Amino acid sequence: HAPIYKQAARRAGEDGTYSFDYCYEHIAPLYAEQDVNWINQETLCSDTLAPSTYPSFSTPGDCARALYRAGVRVFSLSNNHTYDKGASGIAATLQFWESMPEDVVTTGLWRGEEDYDRIPLQTVNGVTIAYLSYTEHTNGIRQNKNMTANVIYTSQTDVIERQVRLARQQADFVVVGVHWGVEDSHAIVDSQRTLAQNLADWGADVIVGTHPHVLQDAQWLTAADGRRSFVAFSLGNFLSTQSRPDQLVGAILTLQLQ
């Protein structure tokens, strides 16, 4: 949102950069205690696109670099704003993430169907974690032939099932981010519950929901093979200027995988 960009620019001075570290300074100590930090990066990040706000977002790369300094290493890129800037936005954000340090893991953008069998993996303390992410929609903006990468929609259940089952084979734990549900609603809709159970049955251990901008419930699910899987249907907002009381309350989910 524009007020955040503008304050970051003021804090950086007049050199044309942005200082977002102030946004995360009180959270960084918590992140430092964790082995893994995952976030839904809901806007395109780049060093080339001009910053822009609602309804078509673009965020300075300095924001992602500040998150990196705060301890975030896993970025989910699949959400309703992924296609906001069309083909040029996809190209710019891919270029940006490729320039980030090697220990950064991104998930949710795929370079065509031939890329679908590539499962993003991270090994931490000898434990391998797979990360996948999907979105319910992209605000009516569809992929075009000039886009060099694409999201996978929650309606593409055959693709999702294949990816989750592949991830189950390759990793000790499978974490899935899903951008779903109704904005500004605490109610969990049937499609969320159905997909969550399917993801658990296919092999997901943790399911993290985003998009509603407010908190929704969390619960344990029993998978088809008897495993217990945890789903948080919506963590609410993390950093925004939305001002409704329930939009101001977000959650940071901490889990111990064992």
Protein language model regions, located:
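Acidic, metal/ion-coordinating pockets
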Residues: 1-258
